[in-house]
């Protein structure tokens, strides 16, 4: 039989109709001579009623069995307002077991007390939980909004290759050996960057793609070895054009998915100010907690360890009194950043306490009250160090304080652009300057004359879209002048041979007329994670890898046969 309705469809308007439903048994309850079954599918839950006359139909039915029923829709005596179908129930006349189920390794409820690797091993069961299905539904809705919006904005969806040439700049590539071309390898692309720029030279004008990308890097809660991007590029466009259309798109997504309004234009914060105020280039603006530099306050201090004009005293003040346990947690965090501990000062009802309180002068106390606008109570957390290191520490402490005091408001979305990034960063490992983004990012106009000789101060036309402390998008104006591109290659010390080997095929296209262009890539996994309030991007991906990059369900990656290796001309060295 073919089902007439889903399990989330029947309402008061269907009373007295004969229906056929199919789904999984969520729960069986006996009440006197009656048996109640909650039947579930992706769309919802419908309550079934089996009376004494048909009780034999369910003798062998258990939870998670897949069944089919025929019955009549009646009005429920007790309404369940939590269900769309809560006004009705179905009196079962016929029941057929489609497939049985063994006892599941964990309860398939939203709140489940089981470790993540077990969930990933039985991912097909984990995905039966409503919260997981809702995550995938929201993700699909986001993709649908993106496609409609960009198509309506004259963007063309174009697919780019998954088998590409390895370009060693950046993260590690996943390599794929070629059987037909012995001893040669494809790389799975870290992004479609070069291909989408070639599409601009091809005259496509406006391109987008929802694309899978691959990076062989260490994992964390917001990273996977394979991930999904919204990738787009615009010809005859500047950074402003890309940022404007990005703002309109994210505004539409949040409105349609969360009914949340954002105001345009978004706040813009320079990289320098982001680090100075928040200790991060992706600050969470749902809470304030700005970082202050206190060198002027303590310039004549008697506190010995703060008396070093070559270092920076950085501090955060929160209008709470931290407990001994909370301070110890921050001390442990400081050690992760190679600081011995943090210092703290407490203020309550005009009384000062803490590790530095007894050494404070009256003038320093007055200046601290003024600096942080302290009212009744506060804890100041501070330390001293080189600017970059101490800023990173205080940025991490800022996040920890927000978690301690529940300042990360749910269903609130704070977005901003971080701009004016450094064009280069110095690699201690390679002992040279490398491109902070990628070597095709244009320097800012005011840096064009000396970006390759004044690398320390050179800024880039790059921009990151940040939401609730996560970078959800990053893009830039591209270099389209071959002379400037060559200077960029020289600046990052790529030899003529390296450029020709890695990028010659790409650079050749610039001989034939390239429009100026700009673009951006969004991390759709991260956006979905934030919008669904999930703890990890693994909760918004159907079949993710665990924190070690392992597919617990299929046990990939795994060994392959000697024959397969031989065909690829590969020999394992033990």
Swiss-Prot record:
Its EC number is 6.1.1.12. It is an enzyme of class 6 (ligase). It is found in: Cytoplasm. Keywords: Aminoacyl-tRNA synthetase, ATP-binding, Cytoplasm, Ligase, Nucleotide-binding, Protein biosynthesis. It holds the Pfam family tRNA-synt_2. GO terms for molecular function: aspartate-tRNA ligase activity; ATP binding; nucleic acid binding. This is Aspartate--tRNA ligase. It comes from Mycoplasma mycoides subsp. mycoides SC (strain CCUG 32753 / NCTC 10114 / PG1). The lineage of its organism: Bacteria, Bacillati, Mycoplasmatota, Mollicutes, Mycoplasmataceae.
């Amino acid at each position: 039989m073919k089902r007439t309705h889903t399990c989330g469809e029947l309402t008061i308007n269907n009373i007295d109709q004969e229906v056929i439903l199919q789904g999984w048994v969520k729960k069986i309850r006996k009440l006197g001579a009656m048996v109640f079954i909650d039947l579930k599918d992706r769309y919802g839950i419908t309550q079934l009623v089996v009376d004494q006359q048909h009780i034999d139909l369910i003798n062998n039915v258990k939870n998670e069995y897949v069944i089919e029923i025929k019955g009549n829709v009646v009005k429920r005596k007790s309404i369940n307002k939590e269900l769309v179908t809560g006004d009705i129930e179905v009196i079962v006349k016929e029941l057929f077991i489609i497939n049985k189920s063994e006892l599941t390794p964990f309860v398939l409820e939203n709140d489940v007390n089981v470790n993540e690797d077990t969930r990933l091993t039985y991912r097909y069961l984990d995905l039966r939980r409503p919260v997981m299905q809702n995550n995938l539904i929201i993700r699909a809705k986001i993709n649908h909004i993106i496609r409609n919006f960009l198509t309506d904005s004259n963007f063309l969806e174009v697919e780019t290759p998954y088998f590409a040439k390895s370009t060693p700049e950046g993260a590690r590539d996943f390599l794929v050996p070629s059987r037909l071309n012995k001893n040669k390898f494809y790389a799975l692309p870290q992004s479609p960057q070069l291909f989408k720029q070639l599409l601009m030279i091809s005259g496509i004008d406006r391109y987008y793609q929802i694309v899978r990308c691959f990076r062989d890097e260490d994992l964390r809660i917001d990273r996977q070895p394979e991930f999904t991007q919204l990738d787009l590029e615009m010809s005859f466009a500047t950074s402003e054009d890309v940022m404007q259309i990005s703002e309109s798109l994210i505004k539409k997504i949040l409105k349609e998915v969360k009914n949340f309004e954002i105001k345009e234009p978004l706040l813009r914060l320079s990289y320098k100010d982001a680090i100075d105020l928040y200790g991060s280039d992706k600050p969470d603006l749902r809470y304030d907690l700005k970082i202050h530099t206190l060198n002027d306050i303590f310039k004549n201090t008697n506190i010995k360890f703060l008396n070093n004009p070559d270092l920076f005293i950085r501090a955060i003040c929160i209008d709470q009194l931290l407990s001994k346990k909370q301070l110890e947690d921050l001390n442990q965090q400081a050690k992760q950043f190679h600081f011995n501990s943090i210092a703290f000062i407490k203020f309550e009802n005009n009384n000062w306490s803490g590790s530095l309180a007894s050494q404070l002068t009256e003038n320093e106390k007055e200046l601290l009250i003024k600096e942080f606008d302290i009212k009744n109570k506060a804890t100041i957390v501070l330390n001293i160090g080189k600017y970059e290191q101490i800023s990173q520490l205080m940025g991490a402490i800022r996040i920890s304080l927000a978690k301690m005091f529940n300042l990360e408001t749910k269903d609130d979305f704070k977005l901003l652009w971080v701009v004016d990034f450094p064009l280069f960063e110095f690699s201690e490992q390679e002992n040279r300057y490398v491109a902070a983004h990628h070597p095709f990012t244009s320097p800012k106009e005011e840096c064009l004359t000396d970006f390759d000789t004044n690398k320390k101060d050179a800024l880039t036309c790059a921009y990151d879209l940040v939401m609730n402390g996560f970078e959800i998008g990053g893009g830039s104006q591209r270099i389209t002048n071959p002379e400037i591109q060559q200077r960029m290659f020289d600046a990052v010390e790529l030899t003529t041979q390296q450029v020709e080997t890695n990028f010659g095929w790409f650079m050749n296209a610039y001989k034939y007329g390239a429009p100026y262009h700009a673009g951006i890539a969004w991390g759709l996994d991260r956006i979905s994670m934030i919008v669904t309030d999930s703890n990890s991007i693994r909760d918004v991906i159907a079949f993710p890898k665990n924190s070690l990059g392992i597919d617990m369900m299929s046990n990939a990656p795994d060994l392959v046969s000697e024959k397969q290796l031989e065909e690829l001309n590969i020999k394992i060295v033990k």
